[in-house]
From Swiss-Prot:
Keywords per UniProt: Electron transport, Membrane, Mitochondrion, Mitochondrion inner membrane, NAD, Respiratory chain, Translocase, Transmembrane, Transmembrane helix, Transport, Ubiquinone
Signal peptide segment: none
Native source species: Sus scrofa (Pig)
GO CC, any one term: mitochondrial inner membrane
Keyword Translocase: yes
Reaction equation(s) it catalyzes: a ubiquinone + NADH + 5 H(+)(in) = a ubiquinol + NAD(+) + 4 H(+)(out)
Name assigned to this protein: NADH-ubiquinone oxidoreductase chain 4L
Subunit structure: Core subunit of respiratory chain NADH dehydrogenase (Complex I) which is composed of 45 different subunits.
Gene Ontology BP annotations: ATP synthesis coupled electron transport
Enzyme Commission number: 7.1.1.2
Function: Core subunit of the mitochondrial membrane respiratory chain NADH dehydrogenase (Complex I) which catalyzes electron transfer from NADH through the respiratory chain, using ubiquinone as an electron acceptor. Part of the enzyme membrane arm which is embedded in the lipid bilayer and involved in proton translocation.
Domain of life, source organism: Eukaryota
Principal subcellular localisation of the protein: mitochondrion
Family designation: Belongs to the complex I subunit 4L family.
Length: 98
């Protein structure tokens, strides 16, 4: 396995570990999710370019669109929670408190 792939897999694993460790704040969770999506985007682009699989050329672009939608929804949720509660704790997102 080339060193580039190992570095991208390690970046994904570090972002996943950060998501699992720092899950109390919504902003840190969103940053870790963005790191995971970025590493998935780079990995899928490299795999498609190296295998010359032309039918899957749209897959990284679709992944990037989903990452942008996820970021927009996450930031709007962050603004809503911080305006309502004054903090960005994930525990404020409990649906049973409605």
């Amino acid at each position: 396995m080339p060193l580039v792939y190992m570095n991208i897999i390690m970046a994904f694993a570090i972002a996943l570990a950060g998501l699992l460790m720092y899950r109390s704040h919504l902003m840190s969770s969103l940053l870790c999710l963005e790191g995971m999506m970025l590493s998935l985007f780079i990995m899928s682009t490299l795999i498609i370019l190296n295998t010359h699989f032309t039918l899957a050329n749209m897959m990284p672009i679709i992944l990037l669109v989903f990452a942008a939608c996820e970021a927009a929804l996450g930031l709007s949720l962050l603004v809503m929670v911080s305006n309502t509660y004054g903090t960005d704790y994930v525990q404020n997102l409990n649906l049973l408190q409605c």
